[in-house]
């Protein structure tokens, strides 16, 4: 199975650089995975697709202002993107500079926001492959420093500096647990009135946590997808969520994941539980689950998701869920119908294809 099987041509003007004025003002492409039929709708029509007793699962991770600009103490400019906070004073980060900092190098960060001479210092203490371990000398915890001086880590394809409005719009309204460096973007379409309408309809709601890492934007650098090494991200699925899933399955209702990160959290928990002979069990661990055509989904029955990059692991996940041909046809239609793509773009609602295992490239 080749990465090129998941290619499609995307005109640059279809990449959404800004969100819609209202969260729910996006368009929605409904794809029936079983029949391959798709239909153009508006996002608020999603309420008609979700039934009483269904369980909607969201990812409640909160994006940290993870991008810092600064300089080496020796003077060279650099950019830091925090990937993971290790403790109150240490983090793992990507560092972009003309020359990679060496162990022991001192970095001065945050002066663009705090003023020249008011930046804070970090020492590069170790390197772990592409990531640098940074130790912050300040008394304040890393999260506090990022809140003061960090920029929202907009994805590279948005191709503009972050603005004040992104502080709100690049977060879901229910985000709670700090730790992501990218938003779980399917959730950006939901506002509080929509959540209240879902609850009033008798739809059940649950939250998992997966801290989305910068690896989600990394291209697949191999020809055969079986050679791809998936990045790891930390995920949590609590006992309470497991109980909700089991109760939903017992009544014949659907488990609906909001976003690929929710899918990966839930299916990671199911995959780990299978070794114990269980359908699903609590999960608190890193996951590098890679779902591509030929892989099965043990729990998730339907999916709300945005439109993803060509040749990305996320379009592979959607193809595994809806069927390869169904997915590529729906994407071709989305391009022709001028849907808006990627993080600030439009959404899809997909019913699982029970025959997806037979629909391979």
From Swiss-Prot:
Predominant place of localization: cytoplasm
UniProt KW Transferase keyword: yes
Transmembrane segments: none
Enzyme Commission number: 2.4.99.17
Keyword annotations of the record: Cytoplasm, Queuosine biosynthesis, S-adenosyl-L-methionine, Transferase
GO biological process, one term: queuosine biosynthetic process
Annotated Gene Ontology cellular component terms: cytoplasm
Signal sequence bounds: none
The protein's assembly and partners: Monomer.
General function of this protein: Transfers and isomerizes the ribose moiety from AdoMet to the 7-aminomethyl group of 7-deazaguanine (preQ1-tRNA) to give epoxyqueuosine (oQ-tRNA).
Protein family according to the UniProt entry: Belongs to the QueA family.
Full protein name: S-adenosylmethionine:tRNA ribosyltransferase-isomerase
Origin species: Actinobacillus pleuropneumoniae serotype 7 (strain AP76)
